Amino acid sequence: IANIYLDAFDEEMKQRGHRIVRYADDILILCCSRTAAENAKAQATHILEGKLKLSVNTEKTHITHSDDGVKFLGVEIGTKHTRIQPKKLTAFKAKLKQMTKRNGGMPLQSVINALNPLLRGFSYYFKIANASRAFKQIASWLRRRLRSIQLKLWKKASRLHRWLRQHGYKGKFAHIKMTSWCSARSPLASYAMPNSWFDELGLMNLENVETGYVFSNYAK
């Protein structure tokens, strides 16, 4: 409804020569100077409140320089970068953590199947940002959590040892506690469950997502 109702706002601002980006009722106006920004803010307020009879949230409406970063739709847009807002990354990791509890008792494949839609949705939305480092860190952390789940599902070290032998491991077996979070980053766990193994299980790999792309339907 907001998109339809605010079409008139979009058109009038464009006719006045302003470059805007809007999603629902979140609006970003791009200007070349502070004076131009003040003018655009005044005109936008006049259209929204005077013509469309809407209220403008003065606490959220402000002018800032791109060097300081502009927060918009979960990303922070700067002169030289666009990054995911830290609070969005924290919330995303909290969801992943909730879905990868070691006491869940679900088969690892079921956990991965449940994770993939969330991973796809998040990465597709935020691939506009320069997020390759953040995606790589999350992918590594998530694989460790999944290794921890599988270790607990195996329960006994003998099952891990058998799995390792079946997959070509010929070294000695160091002591490993199957329920320890630290064990999930051990050499034995990494050998038993390499990154390629998770690819075979179909885990969506955030490291493969191309980031830092901007697609605009507004540009002419």
What is each model feature region?
Residues I1-K220:
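Non-catalytic terminal/accessory segments
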